[in-house]
């Protein structure tokens, strides 16, 4: 997986766009069975790789998108979609347990059972490791990540309307860490690398699109950035209520999931968000004056 994604969590970011699209085609009644079999195989392989990443972002994105899709489809027409939703959820759960067994198998290759009992990880431990650690400030990389978010937020609060300026905010970040935060190993590494390589080569971004835009452009810049997305989400919800169309549900969830990516990384990681935004505007404006 690292040969494709240098950061395993990016697998979850790309899932934000791909999973709603796969669900849309799996739910399409007009597709022939061979096409659905190939698509179902691809879906199974993709979520198998998500589970193999052992990345919190990938797990959280998959769980969140799946819950949104299930809720959206059942509210749209639960009688029509109940059986296939249960089938897809069952397949996903089965693949999760298969991935746990596969991880145990890979981890124990080369370990002699005569010398030492091979370590095993349970499904509960996998869930706790990758989802239970999301909120804890002292869990895994959360300490440095939260410190970075707080530093950018403090910076933004000094100039809440207009911010510090695009690209300038990354240069000032190290000055907004508190003393205790500078003792974090991750923060120490960032500051050390910036001192060594310089600001241009090693800027310290916020790992959060929205906090970074707030620190750079203030509330005015952040509001201007979010307005097109807010408008299109409102129009898609309006279309779903009016036309009860599965396509709009999948598109709405894809846009929401892609926006969630910005809460844990830069939106430039998933350029597909801009394609989704353009597609959404084409769908909404293409309805004509009668909507």
For the regions a protein language model found, what residue spans apply to each?
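Membrane-interface micro-motifs in multi-pass membrane enzymes
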Residues: 2-18, 206-209, 214-221, 267-271
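Long extracytoplasmic/lumenal interhelical loops at the membrane interface
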Residues: 2, 136-150, 154, 158, ...
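Loop-to-transmembrane alpha-helix initiation sites
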Residues: 58-62, 265-277
């Amino acid at each position: 997986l690292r040969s494709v994604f240098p950061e395993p969590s990016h697998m979850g970011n790309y899932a934000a766009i791909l999973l709603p699209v796969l669900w849309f085609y799996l739910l399409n009644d007009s597709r022939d069975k061979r096409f659905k079999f190939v698509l179902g195989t691809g879906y199974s392989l993709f979520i198998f790789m998500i589970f193999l990443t052992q990345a919190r972002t990938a797990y959280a994105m998959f769980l969140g998108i799946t819950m949104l899709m299930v809720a959206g489809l059942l509210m749209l027409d639960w009688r029509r979609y109940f059986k296939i939703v249960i089938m897809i959820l069952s397949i996903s759960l089965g693949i999760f347990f298969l991935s746990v067994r596969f991880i145990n198998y890979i981890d124990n290759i080369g370990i002699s059972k005569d010398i030492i009992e091979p370590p095993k990880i349970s499904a509960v431990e996998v869930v706790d490791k990758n989802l239970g650690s999301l909120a804890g400030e002292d869990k895994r990389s959360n300490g440095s990540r939260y410190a970075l978010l707080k530093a950018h937020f403090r910076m933004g609060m000094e100039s809440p309307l207009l911010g510090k300026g695009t690209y300038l905010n990354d240069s000032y970040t190290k000055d907004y860490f508190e003393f205790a935060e500078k003792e974090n190993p991750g923060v120490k590494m960032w500051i050390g690398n910036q001192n060594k390589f310089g600001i241009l080569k090693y800027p310290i971004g916020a790992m959060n699109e929205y906090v970074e835009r707030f620190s750079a452009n203030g509330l005015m810049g952040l509001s201007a950035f979010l307005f097109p997305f807010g408008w299109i989400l409102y129009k898609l919800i309006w279309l779903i209520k009016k036309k009860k169309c599965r396509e709009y549900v999948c598109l709405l969830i894809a846009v929401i999931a892609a926006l969630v990516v910005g809460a844990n990384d830069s939106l430039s990681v998933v350029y597909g968000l801009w394609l989704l935004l353009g597609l959404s505007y084409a769908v909404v404006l293409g309805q004509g004056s009668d909507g």
